[in-house]
Amino acid sequence: MNDILIRIARRIKKNIIWIIAVPIILGAAGYILPSQIADQKSYTAEDTLAVGSYDHPVYNSTEEIPLLLKSDSFLKEALPDEKDEDVAEIKEKLTINTESKSLLTLSYSDEDKDRTESVLNAISSTFLKNDQKLYAEREAVIRSSIDALEGESVSEDSKVDKERFLYELKNTQLNLKAASVTDSETVSETAGGGMSPKKKAVLGVMIGLTIAFMFVVIPEFFRESF
């Protein structure tokens, strides 16, 4: 046993420089590299969308809207300056969740805060613009029907039917609703922050000491065994 300790001491003395250097290098690497990673952040912008109600098969459907918003044609309309590969990336980063029959949550994540907000804003704004146009067209048709029916002369026998039709049209007009964004926010999420730089530096030193111990001690025990 004394011989092993003597050989270990000699081995330590012979390799003292790198035995000290390895833990220091790994500790420094553990401090510097993780600190660079910890500084990276991703941002998520989120809009809550209240779906409109004017009997449109796509723009009033919480099942169809996610398909619409992720379609190439819609994204190119909303983001005309984006390249095809960028549109594909945006499609991957865009998340749409159905909260209820009339509410959707749109969220988009990116490392650049301004881009995160601008991309989601472009998507939401384009949807609302198209929705408002469709809503206005539907409302105009119903209003025109009401005006035409009110100005129409009918026989006494048809007055009841006329009043019933007018009631139904006016009730439909009252229930028409365009889509709207009810809530909007941007939150940041820090990536790579599981351990602080100091803790990772300590871990690097411990790994370095372990490597040095294995290099110095284990060969001597194997030599003793054989």
UniProtKB/Swiss-Prot annotation:
Biological process per Gene Ontology, one example term: cell wall organization
Pfam family, one: Wzz
Induction: By phosphate starvation, via the PhoP/PhoR two-component regulatory system.
Name of this protein: Teichuronic acid biosynthesis protein TuaF
UniProt pathway: Cell wall biogenesis; teichuronic acid biosynthesis
Compartment(s) where it occurs, according to its Swiss-Prot or TrEMBL record: Cell membrane
Originating organism: Bacillus subtilis (strain 168)
Designated gene of the protein: tuaF
Leftover remarks: The nature of the anionic polymer present in the cell wall of B.subtilis depends on phosphate availability. Under phosphate-replete growth conditions teichoic acids are present, whereas under phosphate-depleted conditions, at least part of the wall teichoic acid is replaced with teichuronic acid, a non-phosphate containing anionic polymer. The synthesis of teichuronic acid is accompanied by degradation of teichoic acid and reutilization of liberated phosphate for other cellular processes such as nucleic acid synthesis.
NCBIfam families named in the record: TeichurnBiosyTuaF
InterPro entries the UniProt entry points to: LPS_length_determ_N_term
Membrane-crossing residue ranges in chain numbering: 15-35, 202-222
